[in-house]
Amino acid sequence: MRQLQQDKDNAFDMEQHRDSVPEEVSGAIDAALEKNELTSQVKIAIDGVCGGGKTTLGEALALRYDCNLFHMDDFFLRGEQRTPERYAQAGGNVDYERFKEEVLDHLADDGGFTYRPFDCVTMELGEPCTVPYKRLNIIEGAYSCHPYFGDIYQVRFFAELSPEEQRARILARNGEEKYKRFVNEWIPMENKYFDAYRIWEKCIRISIT
């Protein structure tokens, strides 16, 4: 009986999560799906600031739509890539080359494909993930609109957040010690990328509560 109730609660949470998608987001995606022919793929990017709700939105969309969801966090730099020269690049704090080679270049493969997400525990590439062909593909995370990928997206979103709300969310999610790394490392690198390429200018700007 307890397991049955837990299953019901989980189903309710999933339904609530799916219905939490902002109308401006679902409307833009629905329009892109209608505009493109049934045989063509639709690619959606969710870029934006740390703590902006990109992952939460991506997961909600994956519950609502028949799609693939990819996380840019699965493409952290490997140890040998973490050099001063790499970090000096605007947008260099992600393995954008591998993401393009392993994911973007294969989205149209009829038989699907595999890629290896980065494992933050072992700091190595993890076991291969098998991905089926889907018409709709959603890529969430900072650097998802990196110009290295070209003009590939039908819709781009940019998640915005005030510095005060960003601080509160990161502290609640990651704690004080991890927050220091965000402030000293990750947020400055993201801001450098945003400013260098003016990422928000090609995006629908959204605030996710």
Which stretches of residues belong to each language-model region?
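ATP-dependent NMP and nucleoside kinases share a basic, alpha-helical "lid"
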Residues: 124-173
